[in-house]
Each structure stands twice: as structure tokens, then as C-alpha cells.
Amino acid sequence: MQLQVARIGKPHGIRGEVTVQVLTDAPEDRFIPGTRFVVEPASAGPLTVDSARWNKDILLLGFEGIETRNQAEALRGAKLFIETEELEEEDDEGWYEHELVGLDVRVGDAVVGTISGLRTLPVQDLIVVESPDGKEILIPFVEEIVPEVNVGEKYILVTPPPGLFEINVEDSGETSDAGESGPGEAEPGKAEAGDNA
């Protein structure tokens, strides 16, 4: 099985670098020079990382054999994957976005919404919850607030501090993609409750 970890955006400069929309919570591990990715479409790859650097909040990658802006432009929109077998020796206590989306969000016995997404951020991960009235609520994915994740029973248990749901209601006009601003491809990052607290 393959896991998408990034989507290539626009070229940067004239030497073949590209911007990357990061879809993993461990970019420092996933994009080191020498890393080889399976690519979709297959005609664009495979690709091997030659260089990786950050420009403000945007990850810039260079790939072996990609040396011009035109070559970089041909990669725009390509998706980068790793084999999930590579993750087996890593920590098993995390969850991918596709495992969380659709789970009920419970406060005690009451269902207060449904998970619609996961945002992996440098400081802490955020669970995106859609409330019954259609609002988006952002909940910090830390053990103190999300003490239980039960994928088998399809729910998470939340113990929100006072005012959490009022404070963290998402403005529908706000965007927060780092890297290439695209039409919201929210492929999975892997998150762990309490990891980034």
C-alpha cells in the first residue's frame, strides 16, 4: 500500500526546484536527500530527492535529473508516495487522516459533530470537526482534550475546556495551506494525540 506525502506545486527559480504541498507530519524525515518517491502519474517518476530547503513556510525540493524550470513545470500537480511498509518500524500510536474522517465526536454521551479533516501543523495537530449546523470547529489533537480515539467503534471522545467550541470556530473564508495553495487536497498526515503538545 502507498501513502501520499506531498503534491508538487509550481517551479521555484530556474534550476529545477519546485514548491511542495506537504501532506505528512514528519517532513524532516520524509524529504531528506536520497529519498525515492513513487509518483502519480507514473510517467513523471520515480523521483529521488537531491535537495530540500524551507523558504519561509514553503518546502522547496530539487530532484535528481530535474535541472531546468521547464522540467520542473512538467512535474506540477504530481503526487509523491511512499510505501507504507516503510512505516512499520515507526511508532504505531498514530492515526492517518483517512482513519479519522467520518468518526463521531462525542462529549460524554452526546455527539457534537463529525470529523471532516486533520491538519498537521508544526506546533500541534488540529482535528477539523463539522458541527450539526455546518460550522467547522478546530480541536487541538492532544491527549488532554482527546483522551480516546476508537476507530473500531467510529468515534473520538473529547473533553473540551470551557469555550473551546466557541473560540475555535473556523472562519469559512480562511485558508491555511502551507506551500502551494490549491483546491484543498487534504491527503493524510499521520497524527498522534499529545505528540505536539
UniProtKB/Swiss-Prot annotation:
The keyword Repeat does not apply. This is Ribosome maturation factor RimM. The PRC barrel domain binds ribosomal protein uS19. It is found in: Cytoplasm. Residues 187-197 have a biased composition (Basic and acidic residues). Binds ribosomal protein uS19. Residues 92-164 form the PRC barrel domain. Keywords: Chaperone, Cytoplasm, Ribosome biogenesis, rRNA processing. Residues 167-197 are annotated as: Disordered. The gene is rimM. Residues 176-186 have a biased composition (Low complexity). One of its GO terms (cellular component) is cytoplasm. The keyword Transport does not apply. An accessory protein needed during the final step in the assembly of 30S ribosomal subunit, possibly for assembly of the head region. Essential for efficient processing of 16S rRNA. May be needed both before and after RbfA during the maturation of 16S rRNA. It has affinity for free ribosomal 30S subunits but not for 70S ribosomes. InterPro entries: PRC_barrel-like_sf, PRC_RimM, RimM, RimM_N, RimM_N_sf, Transl_B-barrel_sf. One of its GO terms (molecular function) is ribosome binding. Belongs to the RimM family. SUPFAM superfamilies: PRC-barrel domain, Translation proteins. GO terms for biological process: ribosomal small subunit biogenesis; rRNA processing.
